[in-house]
Amino acid sequence: MQLTATHYISLAVTLLVTLLPGLLAARRVKSADDYNVGGRSSGAGLVAGTIIGTIVGGAATVGTAQLGFKLGLRAWWFTLGSGIALLLMAAFYAVPLRRSSLTTVAEYLVTDYGKPAGWLATFSACAGIFFSVVASTLTALHLIAGLFGVPLLAAAAIVIAVTLLLVFFGGLSSSGMAGIFKIVLIFASIFVGGFLAYADMGHWQGMTQSFASYPWFSLFGRGMEDGLVSLGSMIVGVISTQTYVQALFSARDTKTAAVGCCAAALIVIPVGLPSVMIGMFMHLHHPEINSIDALPLYLVTYLPQWLGGIGLGAVLLSALGSIAGLALGVGTMISRDIVSKIWLKATAAGQLWASRLSVLAVSVAAMVFVFMHLDSSVLEWNYLSMALRGSGIFLPLTFCIFFPGRVRASMGVAAMGAGIFAALFWKHISPWEINSLLPALVYNMFFLLIGLAWGKKGE
């Protein structure tokens, strides 16, 4: 696709306007607490922005348009499932998590299951989110290389630079500010594009004449089981992710945490629909293109150049903001749950730089890993990420929330260990080809129910 000077200028201004508030917010960061949880003073808007900045990534925009090109409404599951997961998080998890005044998921699990659970949770969450960073980086790398026609090394430099500008100096506050601006850009460009695509297809009547009702207008275009697995995976993945929990920890109080999470859910749910419309429009008018190019090609071809540039900026910020938010989550766990346990006499400035350098290390490590696996499948890393996060975090955390202090600690640790083992080795030891997240959750539930029945007696 050919970009004009107007596209480039509009895109550059969009990136600058989005990055600037976050960089200005960095001036208020004086400690690791300010960096990791915004000094626990975030309002509902910043909580929502932090969540949106990470969850609305390349999968919610480019990936949704790609699947919309192939299957229609089935592609909505990513943002619909994310929104449902965030509503559950707001209803059941936000208040007890914020009330704890902690910083990481591992710290929360330690309160019920002891120190061994903290190490297992740190491994599970860090490894799981790292592979999610890998998946997002792989997508962003090829997107930038294809969009601007630059070599992969130059694309890698752009990814690292923008990722660090988003979170290296300002941490969670910068991520939240960028998230707020990003959603405004998406509504201003991709939503406009989605409505125009819908209108150009002849509205509902024209679409029903051009597409068969199944699979194009069904959420279960690949079957009921596939749809329910998609929903379940999103719930497990969102609730198990440090970055979203970290946003709740940053809220000024429990009510703000719940309201911010709920606001994020209500914004995230409809975000996928315009991308679906654009994907279907491109399938109808350009069936010969590579499906992953559906959204950027539409923005360049069918929108005014200045608006198309804004849309491309929103797409890039979606992909790179997700990487930045996830890297911040992993960096926080490394600095809080590992470095702080080793570097006991660290000063406030030392703790702050430990957090920043952890984010840098995660970003660079993910890029190096991607270059070692350039031909790998994004979906492969997403599956591994989901299995690792869900196996060590989701059900143990859920039992902590619903049955606080009632599960025997040794069984909680056993549940986490067995789940992580299943996530890592199931496909190597089992004759059944199923997603390793399912057996991991079964192992979790088995030990947690025993621990709940056994109780805390004798511990």
Regions found by a protein language model. Give the residues of each.
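Membrane-embedded helix-loop-helix hairpins and adjacent transmembrane boundary segments
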Residues: M1-E459
